Amino acid sequence: MAAFSEMGVMPEIAQAVEEMDWLLPTDIQAESIPLILGGGDVLMAAETGSGKTGAFSIPVIQIVYETLKDQQEGKKGKATIKTGASVLNKWQMNPYDRGSAFAIGSDGLCCQSREVKEWHGCRATRGLLRGKHYYEVSCHDQGLCRVGWSTMQASLDLGTDKFGFGFGGTGKKSHNKQFDNYGEEFTMHDTIGCYLDIDKGHVKFSKNGKDLGLAFEIPAHIKNQALFPACVLKNAELKFNFGEEEFKFPPKDGFVALSKAPDSYVVKSQHTGNAQVSQTKFLPNAPKALIVEPSRELAEQTLNNVKQFKKYIDNPKLRELLIIGGVAARDQLSVLDNGVDIVVGTPGRLDDLVSTGKLNLSQVRFLVLDEADGLLSQGYSDFINRMHNQIPQITSDGKRLQVIVCSATLHSFDVKKLSEKIMHFPTWVDLKGEDSVPDTVHHVVVPVNPKTDRLWERLGKNHIRTDDVHAKDNTRPGANSPEMWSEAIKILKGEYAVRAIKEHKMDQAIIFCRTKIDCDNLEQYFMQQGGGPDKKGHQFSCVCLHGDRKPHERKQNLERFKKGDVRFLICTDVAARGIDIHGVPYVINVTLPDEKQNYVHRIGRVGRAERMGLAISLVATEKEKVWYHVCSNRGKGCYNTRLKEDGGCTIWYNEMQLLSEIEEHLNCTISQVEPDIKVPVDEFDGKVTYGQKRAAGGGNYKGHVDILAPTVQELAALEKEAQTSFLHLGYLPNQLFRTF
């Protein structure tokens, strides 16, 4: 308790931590908790199981409590940033709602960006809820630009999400990343008119007074939201005219200038550079902290930690809510209506509730992105940016929004790019460094070569069911086609997985497959061997963990594996990411991951706490054709086996190339073993039993000690001489001069 209290953690939280047998903070907690309590943005990286969740949960809970306590007692914070509310008093481009390389002139109307590689955007200070309105934009040079309208939820990259409507100089209209031909190209000296008829739900544009016709019909999900003038530039300059000056091409058909819009139609921007007065009132659906997790299991795990840490906090009590898919939204909404302080959720359901206004982000004090590299790899960067844009940068008590990003590695380019975009001078806490394999992990590769191992020909139909990628191909023996070898690889991998389990008499292992259908097929094959979910204690008892399984089933399966009811957990990378599973002796990679960092994440699940672990990777020597769904339904009901470049949903997967990238990343050569999967024991390990601690006694260090012995003896003699000299100088002051 004292150790956490010394970092400034309040006694109530320290007491809860002590009851969890956390006597001392872990390294990541000791570094991060004081930084977060001090008000800074923090980027942290540490291994799974290092206490990373506690490192952000503890300070977040404490500051949320202190904020609520201050509100309860009527205290008001003092803003640390000069107010910018004056910009809302007229129609102009908003200096508090723009990209980092977007410049705005002193009049608020002339805008430019000289960035040649990236787009940078901006929105106006005001938007509209009703009426028929118009503004003009003049192009001052030949750079690239898009102009139009967007809601406050939209990305500043206009037209790349479902909340913005753009018209670009290349003659394309854009909405939700769909770029369609529209009107004409425009460039320097052209004037573009932007029309908005909210009552009819129409958006259109004109060029030099020529009406280009209807561009967009406003979809239902944003009909009740204010639309703001917006633009995005790449090495371009524009000048806006909202009606304060005479229009070059005055609008017709009842459209009026934005500057003439009645006050009842106008909505001011949330981005003012300071907290809004309206945010100070209590809103039940406006949490103080938002924690985003990439999977349901991680979200549940984090929520449980929050509940444990805050159990002794009272007056006011903290209210938390889990927002994940697969659960009735009705239940979550009823909790929101009663008030919530901390929300933990996954992107899909969070996006639904935020976009419909059911979850209000106006009072968020903390934004935590856990496993940020996982969130980005799943394609949630637009969601993160859109959500961040909706959160005021200064809260109602005058404090700055704090952003905390946790990642398995901070060396990812995408994570670095995200941090530059949404964080304010973050402190990097990197206790992981470059990826490496712990010395308690023995990892080997088993080459799967269908040309030398012809077992697949002799199995007939008694093999694992494959993923139907080759359902329309000739894969019969003798075809000698890439498709035949690919199908043979899939069959052999099922056999090798069974062989590895039998050879090493595995009693517990995590088995990683590339796709959900691969997981299901391997589970079915284990059931053919007599195992499966309902065969407790059987050699092939197993459960599955992936996104298509129902939430309660996933939770139940994970618990059964942890308790030892079943021996094997068959899962995908996404489902298993960050899950707290300790002491597993074996990992089998049925397919290598397409991201080299994930290889380290996978095999790092064995060999913890000085226990030896074995990771076996089945690596195809030939290319394998696999699913790679780019369709809108993400693979559900998809049978398009054409290659991605031909408009299909498959790719050729080159595991030998992936293996070389992993070896280069780890700066080592991974040992290869024969298809019989007999793994030779490394000489420094002695006799190894995977899952048990390495034999103590220091035998591994004997040679090292022998080498250092002479140096240590010399150091001891020097220490003795120094101590003797000190005693003579301190207590026998005349001794020094007796020799003279």
Swiss-Prot record:
Sequence position, cross-link Glycyl lysine isopeptide (Lys-Gly) (interchain with G-Cter in SUMO2): K281
Domain Helicase C-terminal: from-to ranges: 493-681
Changes after translation: Phosphorylated by ATM kinase; phosphorylation is increased in response to ionizing radiation (IR).
Record keywords, A-Z: Acetylation, Activator, Antiviral defense, ATP-binding, Cytoplasm, DNA-binding, Exonuclease, Helicase, Hydrolase, Immunity, Innate immunity, Isopeptide bond, Mitochondrion, mRNA processing, Nuclease, Nucleotide-binding, Nucleus, Phosphoprotein, RNA-binding, Transcription, Transcription regulation, tRNA processing, Ubl conjugation
Catalytic activity: ATP + H2O = ADP + phosphate + H(+)
UniProt GO BP: defense response to virus; double-strand break repair; innate immune response; mRNA processing; positive regulation of canonical NF-kappaB signal transduction; positive regulation of myeloid dendritic cell cytokine production; protein localization to cytoplasmic stress granule; response to exogenous dsRNA
Domain comment (free text): The helicase domain is involved in the stimulation of RELA transcriptional activity.
Protein's name in the database: ATP-dependent RNA helicase DDX1
Organism in which the protein naturally occurs: Rattus norvegicus (Rat)
Gene: Ddx1
